[in-house]
């Protein structure tokens, strides 16, 4: 459960991410593909080379979804319901992949945000991404 402090940290750091959200999410996705090669199996039609237009476009989709989640942090299930349906029923993404992507997103944010990425922000953002992952996998059951 996200505390009021967690929500404040997430909103504040997302504000610092700002216009770089799509870029950072694409970088996190690319890190995921390199660090956990089995995740590539869900993207057989993608050009997975560094900086490809497809990775950039999917990074923007991830960033947009996370931005909506931040904006509606008190209603993650309602906000992410359609994405949950898509990933569970149509794409059938293995739930573990959300944890892998979340980890790579945290690494990417840490690399870019420097001193703003405090231990408290790290913990809150980790909890937030875990909450998002839980919602995205909720329709699997």
Swiss-Prot record:
The modification N6-succinyllysine is found at residues 7, 11, 16, 40. The modification N6-acetyllysine is found at residue 16. One of its GO terms (molecular function) is oxygen binding. O2 binds at residue 58. Gene3D superfamilies: Globins (1.10.490.10). Heme b binds at residue 87. The keyword Acetylation applies. The modification Phosphothreonine is found at residues 108, 134, 137. The modification Phosphotyrosine is found at residue 24. Heterotetramer of two alpha chains and two beta chains. Belongs to the globin family. This is Hemoglobin subunit alpha. It comes from Macropus giganteus (Eastern gray kangaroo).
């Amino acid at each position: 459960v996200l505390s009021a402090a967690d929500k404040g940290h997430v909103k504040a750091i997302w504000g610092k991410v700002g216009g770089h959200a799509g870029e950072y999410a694409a970088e996190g996705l690319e890190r995921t593909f390199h660090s956990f090669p089995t995740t590539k199996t869900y993207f057989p039609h993608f050009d997975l080379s560094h900086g490809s237009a497809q990775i950039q476009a999917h990074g923007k989709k991830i960033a947009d979804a996370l931005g909506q989640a931040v904006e509606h942090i008190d209603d993650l299930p309602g906000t992410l319901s359609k994405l949950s349906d898509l990933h569970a029923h149509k794409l059938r993404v293995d739930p573990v992949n959300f944890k892998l992507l979340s980890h790579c997103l945290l690494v990417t944010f840490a690399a870019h945000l420097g001193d703003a990425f405090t231990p408290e922000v790290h913990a809150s953002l980790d909890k937030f991404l875990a909450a998002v992952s839980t919602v995205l996998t909720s329709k699997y059951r």
